[in-house]
């Protein structure tokens, strides 16, 4: 049995039965073997679409990172790990090739779908934001007193934010005078997001504590939620329908492949 097959057996058993293949309950073994044979055959058929050859280094790195936890749990030598990563990279390339064969949605389909779902195409509320961070090593209270001093200076004059952020902030945004740009929900730590989206325009937050340290946020401007421009919305609708078409085409291809070739793996 080659490395990717051993890896697939191990991953299947651990993900579905929470144990190694050799430790499966005898009552579960038939179901495991049936699932394994099906998966093995599918993977063999899929990778056959992609000839052995050069695989982009970036793809190999991404695959290695995504499989790292599973690979670390197995007893695989470095050459075996490399073979497993290459196998999964070929799977990715094959699925991408299958997806490219899916029919693209025509303009009338996109327009009709967009008209039925216009309420989904909203630009979210955003805040033009600046950020100042003082990280904490040991004396949290001393850092708290420092950021209170910075808060008082900025609260007296917003013009003080840029030079103080450049001089004192431990956030990479210090290089841009604290600028984070337009921020939507879901991009910041929860406590920072809550504080930012409760601020009025041009308001400064009180110091906010997080696991990183103490923060100040300045909401320079507010851009309310609004409908997307029609052209942008149509492009988003097309992208969504195209993605759905690709996924549907991949599923149909797999179903046809399984029904035609019920082969086994050794």
UniProtKB/Swiss-Prot annotation:
Disulfide bonds: none
GO-annotated biological processes: nitrogen fixation
Source organism superkingdom: Bacteria
PROSITE patterns assigned to the protein according to its UniProt record, in alphabetical order: PPIC_PPIASE_1 (PS01096), PPIC_PPIASE_2 (PS50198)
GO terms assigned for molecular function: peptidyl-prolyl cis-trans isomerase activity
EC code(s) of this entry: 5.2.1.8
Catalysed reactions, semicolon-separated: [protein]-peptidylproline (omega=180) = [protein]-peptidylproline (omega=0)
Aminoacyl-tRNA synthetase found in the keyword field: no
Enzyme class at the top of the EC tree: isomerase
Gene3D superfamilies: 3.10.50.40
Function: Required for the activation and stabilization of the iron-component (NifH) of nitrogenase. Probable PPIase.
Sequence similarity: Belongs to the PpiC/parvulin rotamase family.
NCBIfam families given in the database record: nifM_nitrog (TIGR02933)
Protein's UniProt name: Putative peptidyl-prolyl cis-trans isomerase NifM
Species this chain originates from: Klebsiella pneumoniae
Taxon lineage: Bacteria, Pseudomonadati, Pseudomonadota, Gammaproteobacteria, Enterobacterales
